[in-house]
Structures are given as C-alpha cells and as structure tokens.
Amino acid sequence: MPDEVITYAEMCKRENTRLRRGMNFNLGLTHSVILMSMRSDAPYRDRFEKDGTTLIYEGHDQSRTVINLEPKLLDQPAATSSGALAQNGLFYRAAERFKAGQRDAERVRVYEKIQPAVWSYNGLFHLVDAWQEEDAERKVFKFKLAAVAGGEDLIVTVRRPLIPSQVKLEVWQRDGGKCAVCGATERLRFDDGSPRTKRRSSPTAKNVRLLCAEHCSPDQ
C-alpha cells in the first residue's frame, strides 16, 4: 500500500528476497525494486520532479575493490567485468525498449529510506526513460519513473502525486513515529485525508498525519 511505513525485514519478506542492493531488476519476473533516499547522507542524488509524480533515480557506482578504491571517480558501469549487463544496463535497456515500442514499461516498486530503520513504500512506478549525463569528470545513469495510481494494477497509467520525502520526515518526527489518533506503532501510513487516486498535488506537512490502518482515510 503506497505511503505505508515499513521495516527492512518487512520489505525483504514482501519481495521474497534479501535486498542487498539498491537496484533489483525483474524480481520474480513480475516487477523490479529500487531503494531510494533523499537524506543528506544518501550516496546518490535521487529527486522528485516539481510535478510531484516523477522520480529521477540515479544509477549506482561500481563496487569498491582493491583496484577501484574510489568508485565516485569512475563512470557508472552498464556491464560487469564479465560482459554481462549490470543493474544500470538492465534498467537502461528496458527503458530503451519501452521507448522504441518493443515492450511495456517496466513495473518498479519504490521503497524510500526516511531515517535509519524507517522506510516508506512509495508505490508502483513505470520506468519510462533513461540516459547518461556528465557529473564532474565521469558519466552517471539517470532513470525516469512515473508514479501510477491503482496500486499494483498492470494496466493503470494515471499518474499520482507523491507525498514529498521532506514532508514524510517532518510528519514522522512531529507525530513521534506513532498514530496521531491512538498512538499505535504498527501498520502505519502517511495520510493526507484524500484517496490516492484523487490526489491532485503534493501534500504539505500541515495536511498529512501518521495514522494506523484502523484510522486511515478510505483508499489509503
């Protein structure tokens, strides 16, 4: 359910795998998973566009090794040393094939780190574009994902505005990690009082509360 608070263990259980990396292409042949963060200490520059429905996700670096001590100085890889596509390459190829009309958009579940041990499920996205751009003296991958309404529905393409990351963090801290109504600490969601499918703009902290499943608004 989009906007719900979730633990790392719960994420892994839901996806039926231990999520050891941020990019996970085609898990179980039904969807992909990415882990994002907009915290000040985040290793990558993920961002939401001003329209509130679009995520620009940065690709991931080469692994740190004895040879590659500073991955931030190297181009992000499209392939591994063996020649197989790396996660960047897999997502990039899927986006290119979608743009060429050769496949449907890749369905991607997005989980966002709000603070240590606290994650939020941002819902289902469609991967619609990918490119490389210069970042100082190296090239990085960028992936464009559109948030879609309708939960996990394969065919829904209506975009839905997201609750911004900074709003979630502010609300979490303001409400003390508990339901604002009853004080429950489990099955929590960020609730702006309106159905997700009818949300027209990104909410602010003034109209978002942390609520348990029992007290959430309809369709939350």
Where are these regions (language model features)?
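Acidic, glycine-rich low-complexity segments with interspersed aromatic residues
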Residues: P2-S120
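A broad, low-specificity signal marking well-ordered, structured residues that form hydrophobic/aromatic
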Residues: I34, V108, F125, F143, ...
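Short, charged surface segments at domain edges that flank catalytic/cofactor-binding sites
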Residues: A94-A95, V148-K178, S201-S202, K206
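Eukaryote-biased feature marking scaffold/signaling PDZ-domain proteins and nuclear chromatin regulators
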Residues: R103-A105, N122, R138-V140, T185, ...
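Compact mixed alphabeta submodule
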Residues: K113-V158
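Extracytoplasmic low-complexity repetitive segments enriched in small/polar residues
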Residues: V167, V181-G183, H215
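Histidine-centered nuclease catalytic patch
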Residues: C182-L211
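Short Cys/His-centered divalent metal-binding micro-motifs
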Residues: V208-Q220
